[in-house]
Swiss-Prot record:
Job of this protein: May act as a metallochaperone involved in nitrous oxide reductase assembly. Specifically binds Cu(+).
Organism whose genome encodes this protein: Achromobacter cycloclastes
Gene: nosL
Keywords: Cell membrane, Chaperone, Copper, Lipoprotein, Membrane, Metal-binding, Palmitate, Signal
Pfam family, one: NosL
Classification lineage: Bacteria, Pseudomonadati, Pseudomonadota, Betaproteobacteria, Burkholderiales
Gene Ontology terms for molecular function: metal ion binding
Protein name: Copper-binding lipoprotein NosL
Subcellular location: Cell membrane
Keyword field contains Signal: yes
Length: 193
């Protein structure tokens, strides 16, 4: 009798606990960038880098992953590293009113699968790699091609090689690189050197 009563009490407690669980729909509304918004790969402030940005919402994650280049977001989506299914990808519409290369905008997010991309243009993204420049309008993308070169493609037509191939960003060290290396050389060596 005691075992039966214990079983009934445990079953009732489990039923109550499962009834308390609320299924809350995850928000996938695009979020604006702030001074605290960091790129997923580079962990650098996105507002300090030019060019269009992207954000990816993963199932179960409270906030999106931001990317300093659209190219990087497409590469992430095609790679094996996702920790959860992708719900949606948003990209800056570079044809939106007020969007510039230095200020790609907020509030002009469009679904990545609906965008038209200019690939192979003279423009480089925020991390110095070739960029897949998104537009909500094919006509805006075509106008960008006339000014900057490249070709207009749908997301499905962008090949893996266009976003996954390593890119040389220049072999000449920049002045700030030399300054940094000089400061590193000036540090005392841990072995007493």
């Amino acid at each position: 009798m005691r075992t039966r009563l214990r079983f009934v009490l445990v079953a009732a407690a489990l039923a109550l606990l499962s009834a308390c669980k609320e299924d809350v729909a995850q928000s996938i509304v695009p979020q604006d960038m702030t001074p605290e918004t960091l790129g997923h790969y580079c962990q650098m402030n996105l507002l300090e880098h030019p060019g269009p940005k992207a954000q990816i919402f993963l199932e179960g994650s409270p906030a999106p992953l931001f990317f300093s280049q659209v190219r990087d977001a497409i590469a992430y989506a095609r790679g094996p590293e996702q920790i959860a299914p992708i719900l949606v990808i948003y990209v800056n519409d570079m044809g939106a009113a007020g969007a510039t290369w230095d200020q790609p905008g907020d509030g002009n997010w469009i679904a990545a699968d609906k965008a038209f991309y200019v690939v192979g243009s003279a423009r480089r993204g925020g991390m110095g790699a070739p960029e897949a420049v998104p537009f909500s309008s094919r006509d805006e993308a075509a106008a960008f091609v006339l000014a900057e070169g490249g070709q207009v493609l749908a997301l499905a037509d962008i090949t893996d090689a266009m976003v996954l191939t390593p890119v040389e960003t220049g072999s000449e060290p920049r002045a700030d690189d030399e300054d940094y290396l000089g400061r590193l050389r000036a540090l005392p060596h841990p072995a007493g050197g």
